[in-house]
């Protein structure tokens, strides 16, 4: 069983790698090298960095605890509820402060040569950040429960959302649409993750 699970997880990981490669190819095809791809990369730079740090901290601190208490229903439920409450409040804080975060990011990085709508694009990128943090908590829960395949599946949803947008909106594709694809994928991954945990 362990060998079969390891093979399954390896295949899912490779699949995620292929999805990432497909996204890079589609972005290059749709945007090439220029202002739009610079806007996409710059708008995501800080929000993705923040989400990655917070998710890594959650994974490092939560996984050992969850692994230890997963067979104790009361403690497990109490801890999971506390973790979900924490990331929900953090996501709400980011959404409330989104205007200030976008302004601060524009002060840190020179956006003078990218899209004129960069302010709005950065705000959307911070929404992506909030969703990624919530997803990161769910991934930590699955890793702690040693249900790694679900963690990997959740990660793939963001890539799938972007790919679908790039494929079906190729004539009208824009940075905002790509970010919308990320948000859509993250949203459905969160819904699926919460459903699996609560079933």
Language-model features: locations:
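Short membrane-interface helical motifs at transmembrane helix boundaries
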Residues: 93-114
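Alpha-helical transmembrane segments of multi-pass membrane transporters/permeases
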Residues: 7-12, 127, 141-167
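Interfacial transmembrane-helix starts/ends
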Residues: 3-6, 41, 62, 73-89, ...
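Hydrophobic alpha-helical transmembrane segments
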Residues: 153-167, 172-199
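Helix-loop interface residues and adjacent transmembrane-helix termini in multi-pass membrane transporters
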Residues: 34, 144-145, 172
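Transmembrane-helix boundary and interhelical linker motifs in polytopic inner-membrane proteins
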Residues: 28, 54-85, 144-149
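Signature of the first transmembrane helix
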Residues: 4-62, 163
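Alpha-helical transmembrane segments of multi-pass membrane proteins
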Residues: 112-138, 164
């Amino acid at each position: 069983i362990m060998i079969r699970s390891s093979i399954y997880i390896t295949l899912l990981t490779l699949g995620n790698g292929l999805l990432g490669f497909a996204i890079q190819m589609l972005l290059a095809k749709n945007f090439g090298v220029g202002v739009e791809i610079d806007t996409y990369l710059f708008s995501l730079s800080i929000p993705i960095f923040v989400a990655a740090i917070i998710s890594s901290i959650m994974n490092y601190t939560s996984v050992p605890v969850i692994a230890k208490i997963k067979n104790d229903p009361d403690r497990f439920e109490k801890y999971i509820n506390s973790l979900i409450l924490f990331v929900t409040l953090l996501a709400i804080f980011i959404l409330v402060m989104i205007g200030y975060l976008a302004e601060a990011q524009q002060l840190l990085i020179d956006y003078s040569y990218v899209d004129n709508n960069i302010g709005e694009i950065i705000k959307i990128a911070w929404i992506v950040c909030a969703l990624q943090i919530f997803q990161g908590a769910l991934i930590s829960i699955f890793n702690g429960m040693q249900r790694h395949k679900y963690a990997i599946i959740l990660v793939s949803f963001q890539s799938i959302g972007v790919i679908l947008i790039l494929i079906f909106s190729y004539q009208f594709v824009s940075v905002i649409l790509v970010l919308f694809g990320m948000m859509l994928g993250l949203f459905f991954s969160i819904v699926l993750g919460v459903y699996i945990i609560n079933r």
